[in-house]
């Protein structure tokens, strides 16, 4: 089956490499080069990235769950900005979308805007999860995949399958 459009889910932990937290630039640059190789084959790529290299709401017993999930959403934005910039370094054009206004860092998500970005040959990042607490980035992955009519979801994470709870 020829795939024209895919949605890639990267775990935040994948960005940390052996450091387990933050970013490991060599690891992320290698991932960016692999993404570019797929893109160079003519495949349109959407990407959702988790925030687990910075924050996991379930690890805090003192912070309100809504606030914890908001911190997680912000972590996904940081991850998308970082990976997007390394993808640009490899020669790709990128765009980052969020489900809520995030100043000049991202564009507000709409299917029409995303379709325009794909038509312009851009790699599209979906940051901020669903924009609502209590939903993992795995939920956001499936939601965005359906919305963009992806041919497949590709998972690059340290867990077999998807989270059905956090």
Feature map (PLM): residue ranges:
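Alpha-helix C-terminal capping segments
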Residues: 39-40, 81-91, 143-151
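Short beta-strand segments
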Residues: 7-11, 49-50, 97, 126-128, ...
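Loop/turn-to-beta-strand initiation segments
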Residues: 42-46, 121-124
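Gly/Ser/Thr-rich active-site loops/lids in small-molecule metabolic enzymes
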Residues: 27-29, 67-79, 144-156
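Internal active-site segments that recognize and position negatively charged phosphoryl groups
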Residues: 112-164
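N-terminal glycine-/serine-/threonine-rich phosphate-binding loop
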Residues: 1-44
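Short, active-site-adjacent cap segments at secondary-structure transitions
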Residues: 14-16, 52-56, 103-104, 132-133, ...
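Ligand-binding beta-strand-loop-alpha-helix segment within the catalytic cores
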Residues: 60-124, 139
